[in-house]
Amino acid sequence: MLSSPATAATHLVSLSVWGTQGTGVSGHPALGASWGFITFSSTASDLFIGDTNRAEDCFFRDSTTGQLEVLSVSTAGVLGNAKSLKPVPSVNSLFVTYQSAASNLVDGDTNGKLDVFVRDRVNLTTRRVSVATGGGQANGDSTYPQISPDGRYVVFASVASNLAPTDSNALSDIFRHDLLTGVTEHVSIGVNGGPANGVSLYPAISGDGRYIAFQSTASNLVAGDSEGRTDIFLRDMLTGVTERISVASDGSPAERNSGYPDLSDDGRYVIFISMARNLSVGDTNNYNDLFVRDRATGVTTRLTQGIAGAQINGSTISPEISGNGQVVVFGSNASNLVPGDTNGVADVFTVQLATGAIRRMSVSHDGLQHGAERSFQQHISQDGLFVVFSTASGNLDLGDGNGRQDVFLAY
């Protein structure tokens, strides 16, 4: 594995319609196919005229034109009356999903729960998708939405018990909603067709919506799961088969917890973090490392190695893989992934799957690292060339002077 000292070009992107900084906290950024199309949420009330709801809102920004568009509005254009966050766009950025506590984004929202919505940026419509087939409201909170790159499917976690007839466990489960047919399907299903016996979270979806990865404490999703750990699973929605991903190349299960999965568009590569020491030879650092499972070859590889092949001296968090399966972005507080990392806080890095080259992205254009504020909430573009992340550091862009957490684009 190689560590690359190459620096990134970093730009502030959580700006108002006038190109100025807001007075609130901005975060949860995401990218579509284009580096210029960015979604994020913000508590700022001065990003556009008329923001009077005193709540976090979701935005779309075209960095090539400076256009800023509010996403957390009803079809009639009314701002949500409660917090909206975690916007994620389809590849073409025409559809954006997000979660919201607002009750006025669609008619008939009376459940008083966190729901998942999709904003159609072409037709300027807003639709609730955390519903049962037929449109029945969820009786529990729905969170962690992700949208398939083609914009057809949305996956999410929900503690609701009325979204599918197979759900009776009163625990968080994973669901997939088809925007074309309106059908909501239960994803985290046991081997006997019944509900999972544990908590399932953090879904990720392939390009065509066929494969869905998620983490779960359940022991009945696959046969022979008796370790009592949080594992990574992948469900094939076409065949109805679930496989365990957090295993070594010889098929032995991870002996410690694993989490935060993501997968390439074709479903071949699944990434995750794990404390397990048996997924890779020589893993004795007792930190969360980053792994990739190649479903075509059955090989599991550790991606986080430090300078000169050393084990990393910190943990890894929230990885995401580019749609083409070539680059992974992740956060880490390790100080030995690249030379010169002396700030003592979490940074954002990328790793090339083909070469293992690691690059720190959360630096200024001239290579200046940030100070006491961590960088996190990282997201990578479809082609793996661009990264967005959040940080309260004020020295990554000369135009950053608000003293708040902002969103940055790096490449």
Kindly give the residue locations of the regions a language model identified.
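Conserved "turn/edge" positions that cap or connect secondary-structure elements
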Residues: T7-Y411
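C-terminal segment of classical bacterial N-terminal signal peptides
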Residues: M1-A6
